[in-house]
């Protein structure tokens, strides 16, 4: 065999070594990507498990007629009735406040039509349109001792047979401090 003939021969040995090297790098890259994906997915599951849904339904509703509080019996209770249109929060959590206010079209007193939703002493929503039925409420993070109050300028401004409001405990956050 002559030397020129050896120079033209393919060196298959070096090609397989390069192929093995690139296959090893690809395997390492895929493994790292999968590991990062699993870590991210596990972290998301951990975060969502921290926001625990309420175990028992905890809700309260006032009105329409008869105008009295209707409360779901849950242990421990999440709210306490303070007065007809006022509640005290007994459990930290994420709450849905909902309601409907029906204006009285026959109301002709000097006080302007205004319905206010308060959290403690802070007004969180105001309704002033007396021409149509309006919805009140939203989702709020509330803490033990907070009070929620629905106030009218005059009790005669609304039709009590079509006005109500309520609250539902959606979730108890269990965040680590």
Swiss-Prot record:
Expressed at high levels in the small intestine, ovary, testis, kidney and endothelial cells. It is found in: Cell membrane. It is a single-pass type II membrane protein. Residues 49-177 are extracellular. Residues 1-27 are cytoplasmic. The keyword Disulfide bond applies. Its main location: membrane. GO terms for molecular function: cytokine activity; identical protein binding; signaling receptor binding; tumor necrosis factor receptor superfamily binding. Residues 47-170 form the THD domain. Disulfide bonds join 58-78. The chain crosses the membrane at residues 28-48. Glycans are attached at residues 129, 161. It comes from the Eukaryota. The keyword Protein biosynthesis does not apply. GO terms for biological process: adaptive immune response; cell-cell signaling; negative regulation of apoptotic process; negative regulation of T-helper 17 cell lineage commitment; positive regulation of cell adhesion; positive regulation of inflammatory response; positive regulation of leukocyte migration; positive regulation of macrophage chemotaxis. GO terms for cellular component: cell surface; extracellular space; plasma membrane. Induction: Up-regulated after stimulation by bacterial lipopolysaccharides (LPS). Keywords: Adaptive immunity, Cell membrane, Cytokine, Disulfide bond, Glycoprotein, Immunity, Membrane, Signal-anchor, Transmembrane, Transmembrane helix. Cytokine that binds to TNFRSF18/AITR/GITR. Regulates T-cell responses. Can function as costimulator and lower the threshold for T-cell activation and T-cell proliferation. Important for interactions between activated T-lymphocytes and endothelial cells. Mediates activation of NF-kappa-B. Triggers increased phosphorylation of STAT1 and up-regulates expression of VCAM1 and ICAM1. Promotes leukocyte adhesion to endothelial cells. Regulates migration of monocytes from the splenic reservoir to sites of inflammation. Belongs to the tumor necrosis factor family. Homodimer. Homotrimer. This is Tumor necrosis factor ligand superfamily member 18. It comes from Homo sapiens (Human). The gene is TNFSF18.
